[in-house]
Amino acid sequence: MTRLFGTDGVRGLANKTLTAPLALKLGAAAAHVLTAGTRPHGRRPVAIVGRDPRVSGEMLAAALAAGMASRGVDVLRVGVIPTPGVAFLTDDYGADMGVMISASHNPMPDNGIKFFSAGGHKLPDEVEDEIERVMDDLPEEGPTGHGIGRVIEEAPDARGRYLQHLADAVPTDLSGITVVVDAANGAASVIAPQAYEAAGAKVIAIHNTPNAYNINEKCGSTHMDQIQAAVLEHGADLGLAHDGDADRCLAVDSDGNIVDGDQIMAILAIAMKENSELRKNTLVATVMSNLGLKLAMEKADIQLRTTKVGDRYVLEELNAGGFALGGEQSGHIVLPDHGTTGDGTLTGLSLMARMAATGKPLSELAAAMTVLPQVLINVPVADKSSIMKSANVQAAVAAAEEELGGTGRVLLRPSGTEELFRVMVEAAEQEQARRVAGRLAAVVAEA
């Protein structure tokens, strides 16, 4: 049986694979698993539910809320808000669980459901497996009368509490900095521009008018050409691009050059080391991070630990080691002292705070890391599980590694959220990386 949960919750085409009946069952099962510890104390459990603006979000939120209420959980719906906002509010309200309805950077027709436990923490694999198991075993009948949970619509102070948290986390004056913000017509629209303005920056917002259908449509962190052009047009100091649920942030310097998650981590790691905030002198990244990050950290005398791809695995390593900074090349940056998950707005504030503190432009700060040529090709496949078992693929990987020698690397991995297999190649020269990656991708496509 195929596992329902991927690397970032449950995702699928809304109303096709991710349906309201499925959301109802997920809500009931998650409520049963995640609130079991509160029952002996006689307290009614509470769940926080947020979403991004895509059209299917309201339908799925209603179904999830019904499922949780049917198991005796009071549901507080907080409306459109970033994923890290749900994580924060789950902790801030003292809730027993949180749910975010979003497919992040995926196209509008998709949607997803991700759960948080008490304290705003993402679930480990074994808890997700338990939720899946319970889905098939729960009886249709639940509590009756006073035992049924209530659904409370749109908590009026939720966004304000989250905005105050961001201001408290990065108490800095950004006066004199002009920033273009691409909100991806997503959840960032209701938070990021406001947070940056509150810190004193001059904000030029683009793709900031969600209408339920335009989320991620040729905008946001997966379409960086938009913000590159806007930064140059407005003569801004930088640009910050978010994804649909605002848990990631990529940047653009004043010359229109992209500053990716690896470079952002390098900037913040060096800053935190200078301020004695980089606990155990360690940065946590994933195997997808550019080799240039490792070299930059060696130069800065900072230890680099790597994990599997997915911010949940970065989080696990951060928590296990007691470290203070981690993230992904894609722009998921985690600062555990200020949040339990990646937070794009917090990342943007932290990056601008470093610019303000040093008086240096983003281009100069980003020069701390030299990005090695890297090519990533997403190959559509019918069966992700069979690719690495293919003798042809194994032979192609071995040949590629021999060609690259010690000046590059090869990484093949399945997407955790889509029917894709990712082929990544780094090399000393761009053309070599492109050639090797193209050859590998062709073999994967035929496997």
UniProtKB/Swiss-Prot annotation:
GO CC terms in record: cytosol
Domain of life: Bacteria
Keyword Transferase: no
Gene Ontology MF terms in the entry: magnesium ion binding; phosphoglucosamine mutase activity; phosphomannomutase activity
Gene Ontology biological process: carbohydrate metabolic process; peptidoglycan biosynthetic process; UDP-N-acetylglucosamine biosynthetic process
Keyword line: Isomerase, Magnesium, Metal-binding, Phosphoprotein
Xref: Pfam families: PGM_PMM_I (PF02878), PGM_PMM_II (PF02879), PGM_PMM_III (PF02880), PGM_PMM_IV (PF00408)
The record's account of how the chain is modified after translation: Activated by phosphorylation.
Active site residues per record: S104
Residues recorded with modification Phosphoserine: S104
InterPro entries referenced in this protein's UniProt entry, alphabetically: A-D-PHexomutase_a/b/a-I, A-D-PHexomutase_a/b/a-I/II/III, A-D-PHexomutase_a/b/a-II, A-D-PHexomutase_a/b/a-III, A-D-PHexomutase_C, A-D-PHexomutase_C_sf, A-D-PHexomutase_CS, Alpha-D-phosphohexomutase_SF
Biological function: Catalyzes the conversion of glucosamine-6-phosphate to glucosamine-1-phosphate.
Name of the protein in its database record: Phosphoglucosamine mutase
Organism: Corynebacterium efficiens (strain DSM 44549 / YS-314 / AJ 12310 / JCM 11189 / NBRC 100395)
